[in-house]
């Protein structure tokens, strides 16, 4: 895990992926091996959110096609293998003043600004209700469990990888907020809209965040929906998100996901047969 040498096994595949990305002008930064078996992390350079969503969309298609050429399958499923870490799409966000080019998350003296804290407050207040937008499938919620390198709540902290909202170590101009809740299975366009909408509401309403989590956030309670059905209910009950994202979009999205959830509920899992068939 986290090894440059571990990537060598996949050198032919990744050389081809890099070639494709260069030709498509996708701004890929680094590639490292992650904790899971055959799990890789790709980082993109910072960019305009819409342009970056375009890049992520094309990158996913590129990786899948390149993998097939090497007799492999690439998946962006949130939790494809039990007992292995899931896959996320962490989104780092900062806001730049168009007139001055200054990062509004930092004061002139280099300290964190009120806008920085209000943005975090908005993420904490609204991410639970917006969860279904970035955890769009029943499998998405299997990733979000204790001690699996995925968050279970929306605590925030500086360089704390157990929280849902992290502020990485950086210079004042590069101060940013990382949303660690979003899964690799999320639509990048919807993910960008979701996290920006939550942060925007925090700025608009001057929402103060909870005190910073200094320790292990896994010791704190769950504060995110535990299933697709629960997440759908939470989004339906949040009028502020309806207003920002559009009522028609929220209605159509939740109705489609409700149909998918209904189909899932018709499936009887092997776990249920193993534990219940001859024991109840």
Language model feature labels by segment:
Residues 1-280:
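Glycine-rich, acidic/polar active-site loops that bind/position phosphate-bearing ligands
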């Amino acid at each position: 895990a986290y090894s440059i040498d571990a990537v060598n096994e996949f050198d032919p595949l990744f050389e081809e992926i890099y070639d494709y990305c260069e030709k498509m002008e996708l701004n890929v930064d680094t590639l490292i091996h992650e904790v899971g078996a055959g799990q890789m992390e790709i980082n993109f350079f910072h960019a305009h959110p819409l342009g970056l969503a375009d890049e992520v969309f094309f990158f996913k298609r590129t990786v899948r096609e390149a993998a097939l050429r090497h007799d492999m399958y690439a998946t962006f499923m949130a939790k494809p293998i039990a007992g292995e870490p899931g896959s996320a799409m962490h989104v780092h966000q900062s806001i730049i003043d168009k007139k001055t080019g200054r990062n509004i998350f930092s004061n002139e003296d280099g300290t964190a600004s009120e806008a920085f804290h209000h943005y975090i407050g908005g993420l904490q207040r609204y991410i639970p209700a917006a969860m279904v937008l970035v955890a769009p499938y029943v499998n998405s919620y299997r990733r979000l469990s204790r001690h699996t390198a995925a968050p279970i709540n929306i605590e925030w902290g500086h360089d704390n990888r157990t929280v849902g909202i992290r502020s990485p170590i950086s210079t004042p101009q590069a101060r940013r907020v990382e949303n660690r809740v979003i899964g690799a299975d999320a639509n990048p366009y919807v993910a960008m809209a979701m996290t920006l909408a939550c942060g925007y509401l925090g700025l608009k309403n001057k929402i103060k965040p909870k005190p910073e989590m200094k320790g292990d956030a896994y010791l704190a309670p769950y504060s995110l929906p535990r299933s697709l059905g629960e997440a759908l209910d939470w989004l339906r009950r949040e009028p502020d998100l309806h207003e920002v994202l559009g009522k028609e979009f929220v209605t159509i999205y939740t109705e489609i996901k409700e149909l998918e959830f209904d189909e899932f509920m018709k499936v009887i899992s092997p776990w249920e047969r193993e534990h219940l068939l001859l024991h109840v």
